[in-house]
Amino acid sequence: MSSIKIECVLPENCRCGESPVWEEVSNSLLFVDIPAKKVCRWDSFTKQVQRVTMDAPVSSVALRQSGGYVATIGTKFCALNWKEQSAVVLATVDNDKKNNRFNDGKVDPAGRYFAGTMAEETAPAVLERHQGALYSLFPDHHVKKYFDQVDISNGLDWSLDHKIFYYIDSLSYSVDAFDYDLQTGQISNRRSVYKLEKEEQIPDGMCIDAEGKLWVACYNGGRVIRLDPVTGKRLQTVKLPVDKTTSCCFGGKNYSEMYVTCARDGMDPEGLLRQPEAGGIFKITGLGVKGIAPYSYAG
């Protein structure tokens, strides 16, 4: 086992950092701060951060094949023009639910942008239940709705053979799997592959590694856990010096580093004194496993 090193590479003070995505061409980490309505890009070489503020909560960001990015802003799928710091709406969901917003999102191997919604929280993880749904934005900009009755639509990724879709609805305390049809984007046969233990708290963001194992950030649990979705066993726990770990992705040279986002919202002054790096961006090295490159939206 190589020795694991955890460092806060960016003391960003995110209210709720989320959706880390590695952009190989710029050696940068993209991420969002949801309630601050910001999309951020941290250059791993210069250590500089560029921030773009939107007009509604920004819950996820993804790469786009034609250049620029796509993001979920409020209840809208948007295209982002980074240079002009502007967003163009591609589609809107949940028109009948004025209190909803998007949460986590990610692009599938065919270039569709998957993202789910939730009711706006009154406090972290406190919200009206069953208000959310899971959607995907196809490259032609039409939207498919998969299911509703979601509490907090969260982590998502696809198996290495693209035949399984993994998904987290946080308040189910479960990591679920679906059969996945890459050609059509259809999902079926939902089942649980891992139930979180009490001390692991709330499952949040998720990514897959090059060995097909899942990494889940545990909100209020201060850790990321590595799971085998085939056996349902937890293989590894990596604890961080902050409680409110929100999401994770691989990046850096050969995708050998893990980046973890976290939150400050909901912490009292004493907690912030105890965890001064809360809201920062963390880099974990020495895991001994690599990730895979993120997919880009094809529209």
From Swiss-Prot:
Gluconolactonase with low activity towards other sugar lactones, including gulonolactone and galactonolactone. Can also hydrolyze diisopropyl phosphorofluoridate and phenylacetate (in vitro). Calcium-binding protein. Modulates Ca(2+) signaling, and Ca(2+)-dependent cellular processes and enzyme activities. The active site is at D204 (proton donor/acceptor). Substrate binds at R101, N103, E121. Its cofactor is Zn(2+); Mn(2+); Ca(2+); Mg(2+). The modification N6-succinyllysine is found at K144, K244, K253. It holds the Pfam family SGL. Binds 1 divalent metal cation per subunit. Most active with Zn(2+) and Mn(2+) ions. The physiological cofactor is most likely Ca(2+) or Mg(2+). It is found in: Cytoplasm. Keywords: Calcium, Cytoplasm, Hydrolase, Metal-binding, Zinc. This is Regucalcin. Belongs to the SMP-30/CGR1 family. One of its GO terms (molecular function) is calcium ion binding. It comes from Homo sapiens. GO terms for biological process: intracellular calcium ion homeostasis; positive regulation of ATP-dependent activity; regulation of calcium-mediated signaling. A divalent metal cation binds at E18, N154, D204. Gene3D superfamilies: TolB, C-terminal domain. Its EC number is 3.1.1.17. Monomer. Changing N154A: Reduces enzyme activity by about 95%. One of its GO terms (cellular component) is cytoplasm.
